[in-house]
Every structure is written in C-alpha cells, then in structure tokens.
Amino acid sequence: MKRNFVIIAIIFLFSFSVNSQKNNGMSSAVIDVENGMKNLSRLKVSDLGKIIRYIPLETPDDGLIGKNPVVKVLRNYIVVEYNTLPTQQGVCLLFSKKDGRFITKIGHTGQDPEAYTDCFSWTDEKEEFFYFERQPNQLIKYDMKGKFCGKVEFSTSELASYYLITDSEIIGFFDAFKKSNIYTNQYVLGIYKKDGSLKETVPSFFTYSSPHTDDIYQTNLVNGNLLYNIFGSWTRAGAFIFDYVRLGQRRQINPLHSARIWKNNENIRFKQDFIDTIYTVSGNKLIPSIVFKTGKYHWPVQERKSEKNNLERIFIADINENNSIVFFQCVRGLLTQESVLYNGLYNKKTGKTTLSKNKDGIEDDLSHFMPFKPLGMSTSGELVSFVEAWEALDWLEKHPEAKNNKNLSFLKDLDEEANPIVILIE
C-alpha cells in the first residue's frame, strides 16, 4: 500500500480547508456562501440551464416503479432503484434516456452467487457495467442487458459507502460509519485496480472515534423522500439517524451512499464533510480546486459533533457540478429542531453565488411547470429531478390552463398509476 503523501503538504491542505475565510493566495474558485446568505433570492430554472426536458417512463407490468425510488441518469440510460414493500427486496430498472422506454431489470437481491446485497448501483459507462455491493467485500457486475458478468473481490475487509468507476480504477469513499456500527480504518479514499487490489489510500482530514453502543438509545433508518425537505439530496438514498444519551452528542446523521466523489469531465472531485474545500484527485494527490467561503457560518471540524451554536453554522450537504455551474445544498442549524435547507448556485463564468431557501422552491420559468426539485446530476452534466404521476395530475387540477402548454404535452395522456416523469435541465 502506498502512502507517499508529503506530510507538510497534507498539513497545509488541512489548514487551508478548515479555515475557509482565507484563500492564502491560491487560485481556487471561491463560492461565497456567507455573502449569499446575506442576500437571499429565489432561484429560477433558467439560472440552472437553458433547456428543460420531460421524460415519462414507460409503465409495463414488469417495470412498475415502487415508492421512494432513487433515480440516476447516465449518458444513454435512466436507472431507477427502490426497495419493495413490505419485503424490502431491492429492484434496479433500466430505461431509455431518449424516450423513457423500459429496457430491462438488472440483477436481484438475495443469497445466490449472482445476487447483490443492495440495489444501489455504480456505473462504468465505458465498459457498460453496473456494480452492486455484496457484503462483506465484493461488488457484483451486470451489463446493460441485465446479464451477470462476475464480481470484484476487494483485498480490504470492508466495502466503501460510495464508489466512482473510472476507465482503469475503482475509487471508494469511506465515510467511516457502516450499517453495522463498525468504524473503518482512518483513510477516506481507497484507490483500487479493477481486480479489487488496493493501489493506494488518501488519509482522512480528521480522526473518527467509535461511540459506545451503550450510548445509543435509538436508531432509525429513514427513507430519503421523507428527509428531503430537511437534508436535501444528501440523504436521497436514506439515512441512519442515531440518538445518544452521553458524550455531549445527542444526534448523528449517517446518509447511505452519499456522493462525496464525482467526475466533471475528466476531473475527479472529492469533498469530505466539514472540510470547506473541493479537491481534484490526481494520482495520490489532492489539489484544492473550489472553496466554500462560509465566513461567520463556518463550522470548525473539531466541533463537528457539537450541537452548540449550530443555528449559526452552515453544513455543505450535497454538491452537483458541470462545466457551467456548481449547484449545492446546505443546511443551517444541522442537528437542531430549527434547521433550514438552502439551495445554492455558483456560476463559474461570472463567479456569482446565489442562495435561496429550499421551501421557496425553484421556479420553472422555462416551461411553467411545478417548482423544480433537484435530486442529482447526470453523468452528462444535466440536473435531474422527477415527479410522480399523481403529483403532476394534482398540480394540473389546480392549473388547468397548463393543458394548452405545448411544453407540457406529456400531461395529456398521463395516468395516476403511471411511472414517474424524469426531468432534466441542461
């Protein structure tokens, strides 16, 4: 295992990250969250892109989507993942991005050799493979036709919380807290060959500590749909919420499969919680690229478990980046009863940062449909959302004039039992 980071550089980067008020003369882009909080304004869809598309997903008997799905959009496909009720069996469905046509079901949960543990997937678009986790240390592979294609067995003993698949590597993000309440080693990124052998690691900016299980008096697994208005897309795949009785820490939120690594073009980005810098991963180096200037709302990493003064602190929850913008969501007052979720937008061309309260919605000024609810970004750089058919029909009942809107022609043939409508902004 290679750990040939220069210690002085790591100390410098850490200092740079946790004190976001100082740019130290580096050329990183600055997202001015502090100023955006002083000048809140409502975001519009036209701020996010120029074109909005609606893709109603086909509704065949074997492609009916269950409740609380996670929707991902690839270059040519739409992936929908959900757990059935009440059996909690994981399902992964594949649709055409072009017209919403149902293509196939991908794999299954279970105990047989081809089964996966969790239906949440990661994609190698070049080789056209899906990867699913299989406990304790494997990823199961399927192709885009739903055919089982083997497995990757990692040389390390635990699976990561999130993976990014590149042309030659599998990069795992370890958030340290697993479903089993067992903490991992003190590295945050593991860089693997495609055969699962570990090449090198990137150390965490801070040390994780294990709580005593006696201190946990309540644990809840909550689905992402119920949590959206509190935490946004950060918890889109659901989250464990732990309540404690000691240690001065009454609550901890651990989202499932939180995307802390992503690609923008060929750049691999990484951001660790409570660190105010987005880094570009280059080999075994972290290069500061974008800084969140939180100013008086800064949350010191050493106080990340505290609930004191959190109403005056900002937590950067979710980040989506393309060539033009960085769209992010942040929470003021995390871990309190008075938390507020904000949508943030950084325009790369102008350098302007805009924030708005999530409860105000993002006005659709392009096609005049329902307020846009960001749920992620496609691998092509489109912001993604979806609405259930019944939600769209309820809205149409209150806005009957929309029937004559040519941009919303999909509403004419919509049935309340139909699959959701995927929305893309580019």
Segments predicted by a language model, with ranges:
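Conserved blade-ending motifs and adjacent loop-strand segments that build the rim/top face
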Residues: P288-E312, K348-S380, L393-D394
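Asp-box/WD-like beta-propeller blade repeats and closely related beta-sheet repeat scaffolds
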Residues: Q135-V188, S197-Y217
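Beta-strand-rich domains and repeat architectures in extracellular enzymes and scaffolds
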Residues: G25-L40, I51-G90
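Short coil/turn segments at the loop-to-beta-strand junctions that recur within blades
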Residues: T59-D62, I106-A115, E153-A160, F205-S209, ...
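Repeated scaffold domains used in trafficking and secretory/extracellular systems
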Residues: I65-V70, E114-S121, S157-D167, S209-I216, ...
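Short beta-strand elements that form the blades of beta-propeller/WD-repeat-like
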Residues: S28-D32, K72-L85, S121-W122, E127-R134, ...
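Blade-loop segments of beta-propeller domains
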Residues: E58-G63, K67, L94-Q135, V152-S157
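Bacterial Sec-dependent N-terminal signal peptides
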Residues: M1-V33, L94, F130, G146
